[in-house]
Amino acid sequence: MKKLLFTLLLAAFILPFAAAQGKLEVGKKAPEWALPDASKQEFTMNSWPGKVLQINYVDPDNEDLNDTFNDAVEKAIDIDKIIDQNAYKGFGIVDLQSTRLPDGLVRAIAGRKAKRYNTTILFDSKGVLHESWGLPKDSYSVVIVDKNRIVRGIYYGKIADADIPGIIEMIVKLTKE
């Protein structure tokens, strides 16, 4: 009986720690991944060395949820010129496990977004980032990582308009480090 109780207590302490391994946490290094684009070319975070990354992990059913935020970032790059394009890369990862939309339609939506924001779109067909980063399904998550791949911000769902200037300010500071 004591052995069973000890085993259960040990499992209660170890399992949460093991489950947390690899999950995103602000201030910690982001676990690496490899995902393909539409032409099946593999990308990792190291595909953009020395750049601050804004990673949009998107359920195609919510693809427009953070357009206001992305438009503000685009303005900060192209018009205000406060984000150095040589030190920053924003891109999308389509969460194919969170939708029932046909693959062709999802790829068309992704192609439209890639053109609109002049960016790369990757595809997560196996839910890699659900597992390794703990990102929720059926949502839109934005992750900011610095040049050393340390997580500096995690935003779930719609980013509030009031939070946008602060996030852009953080990106500006990170690109200058």
List PLM regions with ranges.
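Short active-site neighborhood of thiol/selenol oxidoreductases, capturing the structured segment around
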Residues: 44-69
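Structural microenvironment flanking redox-active thiols in thiol-disulfide oxidoreductases
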Residues: 62-113
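Short, internal strand/loop/helix patches
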Residues: 89-93, 103-138
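Loop/turn elements at helix/coil->beta-strand transitions in domains of secreted/extracellular proteins
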Residues: 50-53, 84-89, 117-119, 140, ...
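N-terminal "domain-start" segment that seeds a small globular fold
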Residues: 21-43, 64-69
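Sec-dependent N-terminal signal peptides
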Residues: 4-16
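Thiol-/selenol-based redox modules, centered on thioredoxin-like
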Residues: 138-177
